[in-house]
Amino acid sequence: MKNICLLGATGSIGEQTLDVIKAHDDKFRLTAMTFGKNAEKAAEIIETFKPKYVGVGDEHTYETLKQHSFSYTFKTGIGEEALIEAAVIPEADIVVNALVGSVGLLPTLKAMEHKKTIALANKETLVTAGHIVKEHAQKYDVPLLPVDSEHSAIFQALQGENPKHIKRLIVTASGGSFRDRTRRELEGVTVEEALNHPNWSMGAKITIDSATMMNKGLEVIEAHWLFDLPYDQIDVLLHKESIIHSMVEFHDRSVIAQLGTPDMRVPIQYALSHPERLPFNEAKSLDLWEVGQLNFAQADFERFRCLQFAYESGKIGGTMPTVLNAANEEAVAAFLSGRISFLGIEDIIEKALERHQVIAKPSLQEIREVDKDARKFVQTLLT
């Protein structure tokens, strides 16, 4: 039995992780969980899975949760401290980081210090502090298992392979909600249109990131850290069906791809069960006859400027990816609240990157300060 700590239980990845735990309740137990503001959903999860510890986003949500009557007692915590308390709970074997944003960094590092296996769905952890996370993983000798479908695909393709034989990684991308539109057609698109992803069921922020292709850019930076490869050995390929989740090309020109129907529960389960493979009858089997054909196209930097920003930031390194991520988070929030246009997201990110003075090898404190400063700068652009 593996005991799971789930950070971000009420989000999209969190819910799908709970599906996996429920499907294999003889293999997995939810020991600790955190959530942000959705007290109603959290109350259902608590009563169903009965975790020993529950972290709540803020005081107001905590007061709302207290109004529910539960059939058992459990420990609680509030705010960022609760994220860390949950991540280091002695009973947990695996910490699933399903948080959105850079708030996921510190709990990951603390969990590593307590020898927890990390199942990472929080992109920002590696994007903002990849060098620190990798150092921690090596220092404390803890596995860092990818949950993203693309990185899981690469991870699976590399099982039993010598990393020295890799020629390149090919990260596939659906292209998001607006993959068939020109830049001119993107002017004036609505939030509702942007949130209508053709293939995947995801949260609002990641769905917008998918539409701008920033999501793929962040995944490229993640892949750089996860698989220790330079950026010129990581390619992005548009593949609208989302059937091939990613590929690895080796020096002998062989290519290994991982395929499957788009269902995030499959890579989540692989991260939880690794090195085992468990059955998962909830997922639909891949029927290539039914799919009929697979389509591919080049990822154009001029069309997808956020992808270009990510490659450039990754190559520069240091604190540049931190600024990229912080500016993107603030810009996406502004778009979702109707304060800027869809293309305005790119403009804000570009301005934040242009003004930044890079720190080559930042400490954790410097990363936090740069993150805060970048967000403040974006807010000045929005007022």
Curated annotation (Swiss-Prot):
Keyword ATP-binding part of the UniProt annotation: no
Alphabetical UniProt keywords: Isoprene biosynthesis, Manganese, Metal-binding, NADP, Oxidoreductase
Residues annotated as binding NADPH: T10, G11, S12, I13, G36, K37, N38, N122, E124, G203
EC number: 1.1.1.267
SUPFAM superfamilies cross-referenced by the UniProt entry: 1-deoxy-D-xylulose-5-phosphate reductoisomerase, C-terminal domain, Glyceraldehyde-3-phosphate dehydrogenase-like, C-terminal domain, NAD(P)-binding Rossmann-fold domains
Keyword Oxidoreductase (UniProt): yes
Pfam families: DXP_redisom_C, DXP_reductoisom, DXPR_C
Chain residues that bind 1-deoxy-D-xylulose 5-phosphate: K123, S149, E150, S174, H197, S210, N215, K216, E219
Cofactor entry: Mg(2+); Mn(2+)
GO molecular function: 1-deoxy-D-xylulose-5-phosphate reductoisomerase activity; manganese ion binding; NADPH binding
Signal peptide: none
Binding-site positions, Mn(2+): D148, E150, E219
InterPro entries to which the protein is assigned, alphabetical: DXP_reductoisomerase, DXP_reductoisomerase_C, DXP_reductoisomerase_N, DXPR_C, DXPR_C_sf, NAD(P)-bd_dom_sf
Pathway involvement of the protein, from the record: Isoprenoid biosynthesis; isopentenyl diphosphate biosynthesis via DXP pathway; isopentenyl diphosphate from 1-deoxy-D-xylulose 5-phosphate: step 1/6
Biological processes annotated in GO: isopentenyl diphosphate biosynthetic process, methylerythritol 4-phosphate pathway involved in terpenoid biosynthetic process
Catalysis performed (reactions): 2-C-methyl-D-erythritol 4-phosphate + NADP(+) = 1-deoxy-D-xylulose 5-phosphate + NADPH + H(+)
Family: Belongs to the DXR family.
Function: Catalyzes the NADPH-dependent rearrangement and reduction of 1-deoxy-D-xylulose-5-phosphate (DXP) to 2-C-methyl-D-erythritol 4-phosphate (MEP).
Protein name according to UniProt: 1-deoxy-D-xylulose 5-phosphate reductoisomerase
Source organism: Bacillus licheniformis (strain ATCC 14580 / DSM 13 / JCM 2505 / CCUG 7422 / NBRC 12200 / NCIMB 9375 / NCTC 10341 / NRRL NRS-1264 / Gibson 46)
Gene: dxr
